[in-house]
């Protein structure tokens, strides 16, 4: 009986020891989990603080330059509408403030790209922290890959991308409504596919007053462009670079003289093939407009009052 009692006591001790070991193990596990969670919380807090710092830094940069930064989020389809609305509001406020103080407003527009001269134009605009508007022609680019790169570069640098037809062949485009519709649809879909954004701005080849279109411009072509959700823009200052041979000095004089006589100028220039003199004149034009004439140079947005020919 004594031996049996001893065995029972030993068994109880073993069981109690096992339970104690399990309790100690559980305590260790819980302690380690708490430390891991603390580290995770610290990391999360650190990430949040980093994000706040990044946003603050970006805001300070925007304030210093006067130009809203284009963020990666703006390239996402879900935020396109919001970012465009914010951009419109930003430039609308700048224009309102400038007009109240008596400053001239200038919209620089470039037709017939994107070609091999477009990258140089973009770099020059960057040097002067100026945003412009590009009305591009589909088949004037060396290739579709080139067009994709340049169209998206125009957008990512904060400029406005508009369209100027796919072929720019006025004789063919304005031959009939069906021909016009086919070209406009082609370019609209082409730009949407390459950029992920449907275009909102259109410039008629030759302008809306072109003799190729006659009365059909008002009755057919303009209503169709508007049915696509686009606004068309003409110009009220011409650089004269579309007429063939012209020197950089003459391009400069045409632009500066035109802007001098207007409170609001929509300037027509070209960045397509053969317009090297325009590209060469651009730094002098920007220097005079900014440093001598104190003009506000902004891109066309939805809030911009269109300059359009009167019918």
Regions inferred by a protein language model and the residue ranges of each:
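N-terminal, intrinsically disordered, polar/charged segments of Gram-positive cell-envelope systems
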Residues: 33-103
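A short glycine-rich beta-strand->turn/loop micro-motif centered on a GG-aromatic cluster
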Residues: 134-138, 294-306
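Active-site beta->alpha N-cap acidic-glycine motif
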Residues: 80-198
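Helix C-cap/helix->beta junction micro-motif
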Residues: 128, 157, 228, 292-293
């Amino acid at each position: 009986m004594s031996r049996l009692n001893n065995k029972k006591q030993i068994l109880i001790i073993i069981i109690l020891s096992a339970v104690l070991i399990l309790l100690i193990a559980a305590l260790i596990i819980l302690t380690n989990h708490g430390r891991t969670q603390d580290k995770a919380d610290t990391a999360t807090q650190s990430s949040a603080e980093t994000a706040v710092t990044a946003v603050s830094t970006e805001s300070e940069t925007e304030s210093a330059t006067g130009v809203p930064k284009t963020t990666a989020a703006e390239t996402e389809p879900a935020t396109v509408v919001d970012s465009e609305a914010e951009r419109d509001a930003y430039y609308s406020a700048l224009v309102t403030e400038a007009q109240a103080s008596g400053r001239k407003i200038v919209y620089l527009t470039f037709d017939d790209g994107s070609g091999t001269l477009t990258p140089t134009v973009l770099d020059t605009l960057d040097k002067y922290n100026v945003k412009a508007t590009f009305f591009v022609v589909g088949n004037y680019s060396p290739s579709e890959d080139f067009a994709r790169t340049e169209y998206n570069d125009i957008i990512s640098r904060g400029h406005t991308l508009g369209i100027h037809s796919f072929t720019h062949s006025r004789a063919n485009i304005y031959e009939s409504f069906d021909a016009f519709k086919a070209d406009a649809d082609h370019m609209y879909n082409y730009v949407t596919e390459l950029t992920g954004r449907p275009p909102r701005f259109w410039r008629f080849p030759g302008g809306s007053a072109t003799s190729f279109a006659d009365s059909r411009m008002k009755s057919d072509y303009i209503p169709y462009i508007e049915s696509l959700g686009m606004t068309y823009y003409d110009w009220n200052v011409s650089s004269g670079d579309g007429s063939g041979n012209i020197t950089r000095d003459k391009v400069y004089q045409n632009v500066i003289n035109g802007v001098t006589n207007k409170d609001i100028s929509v300037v027509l220039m070209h960045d397509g093939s053969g317009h090297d003199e325009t590209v060469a004149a651009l730094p002098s034009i920007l220097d005079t407009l900014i440093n001598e004439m104190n003009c506000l140079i902004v891109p066309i947005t939805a809030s911009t009052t269109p300059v359009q020919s009167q019918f």
